[in-house]
Swiss-Prot record:
Function as written in the Swiss-Prot or TrEMBL entry: Catalyzes oxygen-dependent 5-hydroxyuridine (ho5U) modification at position 34 in tRNAs.
Residues of the Rhodanese domain: 145-239
Record protein name field: tRNA uridine(34) hydroxylase
GO biological process assignments: tRNA modification
SMART domains registered for this protein in UniProt: RHOD
UniProt-listed InterPro entries: Rhodanese-like_dom (IPR001763), Rhodanese-like_dom_sf (IPR036873), Rhodanese_C (IPR022111), TrhO (IPR020936), TRHO_N (IPR040503)
């Protein structure tokens, strides 16, 4: 019987990732559609992705599929064809290529979830397939210059911090579930105005447009392919990219650079910086922005307290090694 999950240690997988020289592409895709047997669907995906040395994170739920993956470049066309033929619902699936191809994932993880994006929506009559109008880069740029159009960022606050469209409204939150509750209340005054919603790859803003329509908003739009799709389309058509800063990504890269503007600040000294790290003291692991100077000063920790704890931990480890 095949083992349909990872059995190699995280440390070893990370080591393999950093030493691998094979060119890879980082891809993302999603689709809202009904999946009857999620376990069977998940297992078939795992077997085939494993065969093509795919790494990454894939969620399967009765409402659809959501994936961020790293694929050997030589298998890209084969994998694309496989996905199109895997399920009729995935035929001509939109696949986003990342803006850079730095090392992103080190393990293949295919999980069954209740939902492919946690939204907290419990209304029985909510229809996620009733969505807003897709727009591409030319229309996005035009609407950004229209003062009557409202842009709403449907990403978490820490994502918004390092990059966003100018004048886009931030729905301050750390979860999408929380955002959906807030956005209806905060935007109640704009039910008859043009609203454009965006996120990284499209999955959150697509569901957000459904939620807005369900709650009586009349003119709702969203970026086809999210920020990633917008940037690719603008560059392809020679249009200015109006997104400022970096786009946060949920993998080893942490972010993708889109423009040269640095619009965020170091948590510790307040200087301009757009580099996210996790506190080096593993019991803390706080995600925060840190400049190069503070990285040296605090040993990549978020505070003096964590730095002291980290140094004490490392000293104890060194003493144990000596004693052996």
């Amino acid at each position: 019987m095949s083992i349909l999950h990872n059995i190699v240690s995280k440390k070893e997988l990370k080591r393999r990732m950093f030493f691998e020289t094979e060119p890879r592409l980082t891809l993302s895709f999603y689709k809202y559609f009904f999946i009857k047997n999620t376990q069977e669907y998940r297992d078939r995906l795992y077997k085939n992705f494993y065969k093509y040395n795919v790494l990454g994170r894939i969620y399967v739920a009765s409402e659809g599929i959501n994936a961020q993956i790293s694929v050997p470049k030589k298998y890209y066309s084969i994998l694309k064809k496989f996905l199109y033929n895997f399920d009729i619902e995935l035929n001509n699936l939109r696949i986003n290529k990342s803006l850079d191809n730095e090392k992103s994932f080190w393990v293949l993880c295919v999980k069954i979830k209740k939902k492919i994006v946690q939204d907290g929506i419990k209304e029985h009559f909510f229809n996620p397939n009733n969505v807003g109008i897709y727009i591409q880069s030319e229309q996005v740029n035009s609407m950004l210059n229209d003062k009557k159009t409202i842009f709403i960022d449907m990403r978490n606050s820490y994502e918004y911090a390092i990059g966003h469209f100018e004048n886009a409204i931030e729905i301050k939150s750390i979860t999408f579930r929380e955002q959906l509750k807030k956005v209806i209340q905060l935007m109640a005054y704009a039910k008859n105005k043009k609203i454009v919603m965006y996120c990284t790859g499209g999955i959150r803003c697509e569901k957000a447009t459904s939620w807005m329509l369900f709650n009586g908003f009349k003119h709702v739009y969203h970026l086809e392919g999210g920020i990633i799709g917008y940037v690719h389309d603008a560059r392809k058509n020679g249009l200015p990219v109006l997104f400022k800063g970096k786009s946060f990504v949920f993998d080893n890269r942490m972010s993708e650079k889109i423009s040269d503007e640095v619009i965020s600040y170091c948590k510790q000294c307040g200087k301009s910086s757009d580099v996210y790290i996790n506190c080096k003291y593993s019991s803390c692991h706080l995600l925060f922005i840190q400049c190069e100077n503070c990285s040296v000063k605090f040993h990549s920790c978020c505070s003096l307290e964590c730095m002291k704890k980290y140094n004490f931990y490392m000293l104890n480890n060194d003493l144990k090694k000596i004693s052996y």
